[in-house]
Amino acid sequence: MTKGTSSFGKRHNKTHTLCRRCGRSSYHIQKSTCAQCGYPAAKLRSYNWSVKAKRRKTTGTGRMQHLKVVRRRFRNGFREGTQAKPKKAVASK
């Protein structure tokens, strides 16, 4: 019996299933850890040796629902509770 290519065809059990956090099929059932995001660890799995992977998952690749609003408010100096001045009527000749 070889332990290489011919043996791999006999495998039929799933080692990985869907991860609750990242949604990928990378959650190792026996280890109870995700190979992609590191779940159940509190912090996301991320390494400097994989710069491309960081680029795919970093801030700005998703909706940024909250950060978009904060950025706009920052440009206006975080002003709150003010009313827009009424537009002046254009003098017609």
Swiss-Prot record:
Binds 1 zinc ion per subunit. GO terms for molecular function: RNA binding; rRNA binding; structural constituent of ribosome; zinc ion binding. Zn(2+) binds at C19, C22, C34, C37. It holds the Pfam family Ribosomal_L37e. Belongs to the eukaryotic ribosomal protein eL37 family. Gene3D superfamilies: 2.20.25.30. It comes from Drosophila melanogaster. GO terms for biological process: cytoplasmic translation. The keyword Cell membrane does not apply. This is Large ribosomal subunit protein eL37A. NCBIfam families: PRK04179.1. Binds to the 23S rRNA. Keywords: Metal-binding, Ribonucleoprotein, Ribosomal protein, RNA-binding, rRNA-binding, Zinc, Zinc-finger. Its cofactor is Zn(2+). GO terms for cellular component: cytosolic large ribosomal subunit; cytosolic ribosome. InterPro entries: Ribosomal_eL37 (IPR001569), Ribosomal_eL37/eL43 (IPR011331), Ribosomal_eL37_CS (IPR018267), Ribosomal_zn-bd (IPR011332). The lineage of its organism: Eukaryota, Metazoa, Ecdysozoa, Arthropoda, Hexapoda. A zinc finger (C4-type) spans 19-37.
